[in-house]
């Protein structure tokens, strides 16, 4: 009689263990999900701090106490639990450049939003924009390359045309000196008879032959006193009248 009781008890123990453990696990999972849902009701602490500073718009910067009060009023958070996270966010934000500390040190003092915070958001959302910019840049480069090739071809054509014009101008200049040389050869032939005529015209103007007789006359005139001297010589001989003195 004892054996059938044991056999009946054995199947009862096996189903009791399995259903008891399964509902405990199922009951634990919704609590964890609820905790996760509660934690995800607010954005990251640094983003809340930046939003509080930009909303308050204080000239000298916002203090940690005012940032906490703004977060408690606008977000579903428990500041007693979140206070250490706010201090950590302030320190890390100043170190990374997302926040700028105007006065104070550490988590105390006044804070402003840094200039590095905006570019970070742009980088997160600009993954597709980067691809578009890369495509646009490639298209622009291709257009610039085509335009540069066209410009180079146009410049080459212009240079070739200019070279042809220069060659034609040089050929014309080389032909022109031949005509000038022929003209220069003709000019001396015309001047040669003029030079021969000039001495023939000047020869009759000079009256050297007429002046020669005047000189001869002058010479003859000068010689006349010599003849007078010859005539006077007999007078000198006549002075010898010594016999007249003797007669006295």
UniProtKB/Swiss-Prot annotation:
Which positions make up the signal peptide?
none
Any one Gene Ontology BP term: nucleosome assembly
Its predominant location is nucleus
User: Per the record's keyword annotation, is DNA-binding included, yes or no?
Assistant: yes
Q: Give the top-rank taxon of the lineage listed in the UniProt record for this protein.
A: Eukaryota
The entry's keywords: Chromosome, DNA-binding, Nucleus
GO MF assignments:
DNA binding; structural constituent of chromatin
Entries under SUPFAM superfamilies matching the protein: Winged helix' DNA-binding domain
Q: Which Pfam families has this protein been placed in?
A: Linker_histone
Which CDD domains does the annotation name?
H15 (cd00073)
Localization of this protein? Nucleus; Chromosome
Its cellular-component GO annotations read: nucleosome; nucleus
Q: Where is the H15 domain?
A: 41-115
Task: Cite the residue spans of the region called Disordered.
Answer: 1-46, 115-248
Q: List, as start-end ranges, the regions of compositional bias called Basic residues.
A: 9-39, 118-248
Q: Where is it made, tissue-wise?
A: Sperm.
Q: Which InterPro entries match?
A: H1/H5, Histone_H1/H5_H15, WH-like_DNA-bd_sf, WH_DNA-bd_sf
Q: What does this protein do?
A: Histones H1 are necessary for the condensation of nucleosome chains into higher-order structures.
Q: Which family does it belong to?
A: Belongs to the histone H1/H5 family.
Protein known as: Histone H1, gonadal
UniProt organism field: Parechinus angulosus (Angulate sea urchin)
């Amino acid at each position: 009689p004892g054996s059938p009781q044991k056999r009946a008890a054995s199947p009862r123990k096996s189903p009791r263990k399995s259903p008891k453990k399964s509902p405990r696990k199922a009951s634990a999972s919704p609590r964890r999900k609820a905790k996760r849902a509660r934690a995800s009701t607010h954005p990251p602490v640094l983003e809340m701090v930046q939003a509080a500073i930009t909303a308050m718009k204080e000239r000298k910067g916002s203090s940690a106490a005012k940032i906490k009060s703004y977060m408690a009023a606008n977000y579903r958070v428990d500041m007693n639990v979140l206070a250490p996270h706010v201090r950590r966010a302030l320190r890390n934000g100043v170190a990374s450049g997302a926040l700028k500390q105007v006065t104070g040190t550490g988590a105390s003092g006044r804070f402003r939003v840094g200039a590095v915070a905006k570019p970070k958001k742009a980088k997160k959302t600009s993954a597709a924009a980067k691809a578009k910019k890369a495509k646009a840049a490639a298209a622009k480069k291709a257009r610039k390359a085509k335009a540069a090739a066209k410009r180079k071809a146009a410049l080459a054509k212009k240079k070739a045309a200019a070279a042809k014009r220069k060659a034609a101008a040089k050929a014309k200049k080389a032909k022109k000196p031949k005509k000038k040389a022929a003209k220069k050869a003709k000019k001396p032939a015309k001047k040669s008879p003029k030079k021969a005529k000039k001495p023939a015209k000047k020869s009759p103007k000079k009256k050297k032959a007429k002046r020669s007789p005047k000189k001869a006359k002058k010479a003859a005139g000068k010689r006349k006193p010599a003849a007078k001297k010859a005539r006077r010589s007999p007078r000198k001989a006549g002075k010898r009248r010594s016999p007249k003195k003797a007669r006295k």
